[in-house]
Amino acid sequence: APDPGPGPMGMMGARGPPGPPGKSGEDGNNGRPGKPGDRGAPGPQGARGFPGTPGLPGMKGHRGYTGLDGRKGEPGGAGAKGEPGAHGAAGSPGLAGSRGRAGPAGPAGARAGPLGAAGPPGFPGGPGPKGELGPAGATGPSGAQGSRGEPGPNGAVGPVGPPGNPGNNGLNGAKGAAGTPGVAGAPGFPGPRGGPGPQGPQGAAGQRGLAGDPGTQGVKGDGGPKGEPGNSGPQGSPGPQGEEGKRGPTGELGATGPAGNRGARGMPGSEGRGASGAAGPRGPPGDAGRAGESGPAGLRGLPGSPGSSGPPGKEGPAGPSGQDGRGGPPGPTGPRGQPGNLGFPGPKGPGGEAGKPGDKGATGPTGLRGPPGPDGNNGATGATGPAGGPGEKGEQGAAGAPGFQGLPGPAGGAGEAGKPGDRGLPGDQGVSGPAGAKGERGNPGAAGASGPQGPLGPRGPAGAPGTDGGKGEPGAAGAAGGPGHQGPGGMPGERGAAGAPGGKGEKGEAGHRGPDGNAGRDGSRGMPGPAGPPGPTGANGDKGSFGPAGPAGARGEVGPAGAPGFAGPPGADGQTGARPAGPAGQSGPPGASGPAGPTGARGDXGPPGLTGFPGAAGRVGAAGPAGLVGPPGSAGPAGKDGPRGLRGDPGPSGPSGDQGMVGPPGPSGEKGPSGEPGPAGSPGTPGTSGPLGLQGFVGLPGARGDRGSPGGAGAVGEPGRVGPAGPAGARGAPGNLGLPGMTGPQGEAGREGNPGNDGPPGRPGAPGFKGDRGEPGSSGAMGLAGAPGPAGPSGGAGRGNRGESGPGGAAGAVGPAGARGAAGPSGPRGEKGVAGEKGERGLRGHAGLQGMPGPSGPSGDTGSAGPNGPAGPRGPAGPHGPPGKDGRAGGHGTLGAPGARGPPGYVGPAGPPGSPGLPGPPGPAGGGYDVSGYDEYRAAKDYEVDATLKSLNTQLENLLTPEGSRKLSHPEWSSGFYWLDPNQGCSNDALKVFCDFTTRETCLHAHPGSLARNSNAYMSDETGDLKRAVVVQGSNDVELRFTFSVLEDGCTRTNKPSRLPLLDLAPLDLGGADQEFGLDLGPVCFK
């Protein structure tokens, strides 16, 4: 059957039993706050508050009176060395000094340098003087047989014999006598070249050669041993009072309060949740967390192994062209020329005059830049610069980890007792209990305060004794006891883990200079600095002793002395000769501080500092009940830096940093020692004339000057108004020297005066301008002949003229007369005569003509541009800025109460002795003697003794009481300042006075001669207003006002010596910076 669908809804069933209790509901919201409780009892008195901030400065008081001059102070110690001034501008280069004498030879270097290459051949020397005649050579071997001589002339015809028969031809006749010498034949051809002559004598030693170039830089010495550490510096003075501390951290949580009353019943909770379901499947992995902060930097790694050598550098630029090579060897001898006809040598001509020196050749092109010289040694360590100023305050660092637990401080003093609390309200009257039984006798109670007298009550009946009462309720809690003494310090806790490095603290104040640390190792060599400006010309060195003779050079060929050729192009630098190390020069003055390098990168945070000293003990608080341990609070702010620890040992040298960029100029170093005076600079251009200054005060009269040249006539001034006749003034001080009058007639010649004292030397005049170039000087006298040079090689055989024929041979003996026959035919030609002796050597031929100079070599390539020159000298300091404006005057302070009367002054010096008193009354008559009879017995000498005694008496009196009538003791002295000692005792009370020998006046100068400046004081002429005028107080405490005559511009002057001495001066207003007020006191002169 089809489904009929759900049936009708049944009746509601009965209520089931209650289900099991649900889970506890979530906590309800907090209840509303309860009503405020009653006011608690007043707490104990709080700790003493911090001192208030200092009050504003008070008003400026009046200027006090000037105190008496103190005794002269002891001379102060030498002041600290001043800071060096700015570098002066470099002076213009001085004139070239004359060449200094050669210095002494330096000590031999550790190693001899390599032998330099042979230098180019020197210029040919001049011809030496004629050498002495050498010894005669050994006799040569006999010459070969000469050729047959010419036939002699026919003999003289003999006397005619008697004619005989013609005989046969007779024998040859005897040899005829030698004929007379024939005419000299033409000169023969030159003979063959002779062999070399004998070795000449050893020549004298040549002059000592010049000193060689300095040797190469010696090898750097080993580092010295480490120096002892310096003594500790003195303990620094205590630092200034610290600033007020920051607010302390929040106190610990208080003890748990008492439990509150039970709250009202809450509303029923919402329906509980069911039991927890089973754990779900594992979820997918979450996103990767953020990267943690980087850990602290690790320790520095060990140095890496050295890298492999780099690739070879690029080929350097081509070196400069070498100097011309020496001349080649002479070419092979050419073919023999045709013999010329030999002329006779002419006589030797006189020497020509020396030619004028040629004009200076044009400057050659600049040579190529030489290679850089060897690096110099490291300079001496410069003086430590002054500490830099404090840096700007850094940003607040992150909070540091808490430091280690400090040791417990000493017990603080007991806190002040708290004020007594207010009295509590009286309680309600309790119900009377039944009378108790008699208790045991209690201890006597403390005496109560006496109550007011009550009225006398009626006597009651005696009550029955009551039973003991029950124990009463505990009384109310007493007031908190006073603070207990601080308990003993706990044991120090275990050392906590190292906290994270704290942030950078504020920069501490600059500490005192510590002792010098040990010298650090040599840093790596810096880049070469820029070339410094040329130094001043050094002083001439002492002449050095002659160096040892150099080795003999290879023997050159003797050339004739040629005229100097044109200067060739500069040769290339030769190799450096040996340079023995000279003695170490003194350290130069420290150079100007180099610019400071840039700030390096921030270093790693250092390890935590040592534990600071324990702080001062805080005031003891009231002991609270021990609370539960609260959760750890967040880290408090970093405490202030502890005091600076002792200086640690120097750490090992760090590796060299990279070369920093050029930093800003460092602070000026300490003043170096004075350099040697530089050469005189050229006169500067005159400056523009400054503005006219304010009129100065009249100066003291100067010493009498030399007679001035007469001035021109001044312009005629306008006539002034006639003033009323004033009273006759006291004698005025001597006026300034008037203009010289017209020249008077020639006076008589005075006596010859004593020679005056030497005047001080005048200041050196300005250096003159450089003179024009002088004419070339005439050629100097012939120098002394040089020492004979070594013997040259043997010259070629000279070609002498042919010697004259030798003398005729001796006549042969006359032969016997032949038989008188017919004359025979001529005999055959006789043999050639013996050769004559060798002729003397002919004169030397003239030197050949000077060859033409060779063509100029090609110009060298233009050198590369030189390095940038050093920075120019520091510019002059800018002008001083104008003075700032004056501040407004403060309000007038109230007048102070009059001071107590001062102590009596010191006893003044003894006054001058008074003039002699009038003669006294005549004394009583003495007993007389009649000496008339004795006069003839008195010797004449007695009268002389009396006269001498009397004159001595008057001189003594004049010494003791001088009357001031002495004339000039030293008329030859000149006017000027002298010291006078009035009582001729010790020199402490001597006076410095000006003696004017022309006016015969002695002038005492005021001390001090001038007083305050930059004050404004005037008397208004228009209104007669005297409020701002000067008040002067005299020695009798009388104030002198307004008794001056106005000169000009508010200045006043008085000429009344009765006002002296002046003890005080009271200007009433101070003017601006460009105004002056002062008081100049002129000298007081006595005649």
Curated annotation (Swiss-Prot):
- Cited InterPro entries: Collagen, Collagen_Structural_Proteins, Fib_collagen_C
Gene Ontology molecular function terms on file: extracellular matrix structural constituent
State the source organism's domain of life.
Eukaryota
**Residue ranges, annotated region (Disordered):** 1-931
Return the Low complexity bias intervals.
83-120, 150-159, 166-187, 201-211, 228-241, 278-321, 335-345, 360-384, 396-408, 443-453, 560-602, 613-640, 677-695, 718-740, 776-788, 813-828, 849-868, 897-909
Q: Where in the cell is it found?
A: Secreted, Extracellular space, Extracellular matrix
Q: What are the Pro residues biased-composition ranges?
A: 189-199, 910-924
Name one cellular component (GO) term. Answer: collagen trimer
Listed Basic and acidic residues bias regions: 504-515, 829-843
Q: Where is the composition biased (Gly residues)?
A: 218-227, 409-418, 466-493, 708-717, 792-812
**Broad class of where this protein is predominantly found:** secreted
Q: Which Gene3D superfamilies match?
A: 2.60.120.1000
Domain Fibrillar collagen NC1, first and last residues per copy: 929-1087
What are the entry keywords? Answer: Collagen, Disulfide bond, Extracellular matrix, Secreted
Q: Does the keyword section mention Lipid metabolism?
A: no
Instruction: Note the PANTHER family from the entry.
Output: COLLAGEN ALPHA-1(XXIII) CHAIN-LIKE ISOFORM X2, SI:CH211-266K2.1
Question: What family does the entry list?
Answer: Belongs to the fibrillar collagen family.
In Swiss-Prot or TrEMBL terms, this protein is called Collagen alpha-2(I) chain
Q: Which organism is it from?
A: Epinephelus costae
